[in-house]
Structures are given as structure tokens and as C-alpha cells.
């Protein structure tokens, strides 16, 4: 079974429950309306569905290992992490002056949820980095 991001549900929550329109009225968040949220979520979903989710199967077949002082990661994890960083997903919520995207937590949380749902084993590394 493959991962399908619940974008429609997330957008419903953002618009009808969280009031993203009110968020867009706040200083500094004028550019973050429902259309922006949808574009970000669709791109995050594409990355999570196409790149991250398939790592689950590969991780089951070829798990990371520590042998003779060397760590061997699951095939594909290193490449996926590189794409994660290059895509700017690590800094979704972080201020732009520090290299982040400066997105509101409302949008960033949905991106994080998709990452965790698509492969928790992959998502643990960025999660720890984000908390550092």
C-alpha cells in the first residue's frame, strides 16, 4: 500500500477550522493564503509520496547496519535526504534570514505530518536536526 497525502483534508482544516484567511491578515503573513498553502502541500506530498514513502519497503529489506565501526544506511536514504535538504524542507518553518522558508506553523505542520506519515524512520533524522 502506498502513501497518499490527505491534501484535501488538510486544506479543509486550514480554511474552515484554523482560518488561514485570518492568518494571512497578520503582518508578515500576507503572502500565505489558501492558494499558497495548497501549492506547498502539493509539492510536499509529491516528495513524500514519490521519494520518501518507497523507502519503507527498502528499509525493511535492507535495514541500516553497524558493523566493524561502520554505519551502512538503507539504500536510497542518503539520496532522499539530499533531496530533502535541496528542496528546502528542513527549513520550512525557520526564518528566511537563516535560510529557511519562513512559512507559518500551520503550513509547516502539515508538511511535517506528511513526512512522518510517509516514513517515520526517515523523518526521525530531520526531526532531531530541527530540534537541535
Where are these regions (language model features)?
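Amphipathic, small/basic residue-rich leader segments at the start of a protein or domain
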Residues: 1-124
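N-terminal glycine-rich flavin-associated loop
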Residues: 124-132
Amino acid at each position: 500500500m502506498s502513501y497518499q497525502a490527505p491534501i484535501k483534508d488538510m486544506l479543509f482544516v486550514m480554511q474552515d477550522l484554523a482560518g488561514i484567511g485570518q492568518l494571512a491578515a497578520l503582518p508578515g503573513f500576507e503572502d500565505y493564503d489558501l492558494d499558497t498553502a495548497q501549492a506547498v502541500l502539493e509539492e510536499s506530498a509529491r516528495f513524500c509520496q514519490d521519494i520518501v514513502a518507497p523507502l519503507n519497503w527498502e528499509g525493511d529489506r535492507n535495514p541500516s547496519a553497524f558493523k566493524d565501526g561502520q554505519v551502512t544506511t538503507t539504500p536510497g536514504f542518503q539520496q532522499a535526504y539530499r533531496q530533502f535538504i535541496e528542496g528546502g524542507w528542513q527549513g520550512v518553518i525557520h526564518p528566511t534570514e537563516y535560510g529557511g522558508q519562513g512559512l507559518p506553523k500551520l503550513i509547516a505542520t502539515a508538511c511535517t505530518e506528511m513526512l512522518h506519515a510517509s516514513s517515520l524512520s526517515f523523518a526521525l533524522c530531520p526531526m532531531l536536526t530541527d530540534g537541535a
